[in-house]
From Swiss-Prot:
Gene field: trpE
InterPro entries the UniProt entry points to: ADC_synthase, Anth_synth_I-like, Anth_synth_I_N, Anthranilate_synth_I_arc_typ, Chorismate_C
Classification of source organism: Archaea, Methanobacteriati, Methanobacteriota, Archaeoglobi, Archaeoglobales
Enzyme Commission (EC) number: 4.1.3.27
EC top class, as a word: lyase
Originating species: Archaeoglobus fulgidus (strain ATCC 49558 / DSM 4304 / JCM 9628 / NBRC 100126 / VC-16)
The protein's name in its UniProt record: Anthranilate synthase component 1
Keyword Metal-binding attributed: yes
Residues that coordinate or bind chorismate: 237-238, 350, 369, 382-384
Amino acid sequence: MQKHEYVNPVKLYSAIRDEKFPFILESAEKSGRARYTYISFNPLYTVRVGSRTRVDGEVISKISDPFDALNEIHVKGLLVGYVAYEAVKNYIGKKPQTPSVFGCYDGYFVYDHYLRKLFSVNVENADKIVERAKRVEVEQVRGNSEVLRAGSREKFEKMVERGKEQIFEGEVYQIVLSREYVVDTDLSPFQMYLNLRETNPSPYMFLLEFDRALIGSSPETMGRVEGNSFIINPIAGTARREAGREKEIAEKLLSDEKERAEHVMLVDLARNDVRKVCRAGSVRVSRFMEVVEYPSVLHIESEVVGELKAGVTHFDAMKATFPAGTVTGAPKLRAIELIDEIEGDCRGVYAGAVGYFSENVSDLAIAIRMIEFDGKARIRAGAGIVADSVPEREFFETENKIARVLRAVGL
């Protein structure tokens, strides 16, 4: 490990972003989840898991579950990428339309923000890269953007009614339904990231410029393995933030029976997921129903922790909780089937997971508050539907969640 003079992370990323498969996983909020930032490029190899598993483009197996595929490859190094929500199609007898993609990196830069230090691990010409980064000028650009398509209020409210019908029929207790914006923009993924970093800083900021680019600011941990501990951070319960009224809004949010019921249901689901891979008696709720403030919304958050059973890999642990109950509903499998039926389109990466695996620590955020860019910017937001949901209210919840992400593309 080599120590370097501190340079702004976005300047360092800008200095390497013309290389292959560059990424930045950045902490942009002062919390326990906001200590480290990772930057790298030029992976040793890439892994794509769709209907088959490919390494550097070559088919190596017929495995279509990304967690099973990564277990089989026996990865050495830092594995960074995303598991597309579409991987859930494996659970309902369909083929994923969007592949899950990872790069395996043997060298990387890492920031420790508590110590305000920058290190490199096995990066060739690291000093030269850092010196080049010091000279980089980073400028935010608002750009020109146009909404090509947006999930209409009328359509979404009809979806909510269909979801409620399934709840009344006893199919599910809760279902999370989403809607999508498609935006034409002249902004680059990096420019969108700079804007999002300003408008919606979160514990999990990410920019992955792979075959498609992912630009995101997720508040929510899908799963984290640290040593032998497995941690899930369910977030459910949302209110729009208004300056000067945060305490009042938080109290109202915590006293809302619908929001409380939804949150408790998803904490129970998280406990069940953690129990699948953790020692009996080790699972506990370490934080329960705390209101956390974000730039545009307030969320109710909890944390579930357990100790992994012997022989459970990091990939096994993440598979146990994928996809997160907070983006599907409960019971999870039936909710997934109904989402496929009611939404009727491809979620892509949205509601999947983004992050990294390493030997000692692995950390995946839920792929929300994000832009998926493949020539057009695709932005989704969802709301949890329960028996007493009001369609109009659920529509505006999606609007509140998506507002700051739209600002990142100049809207």
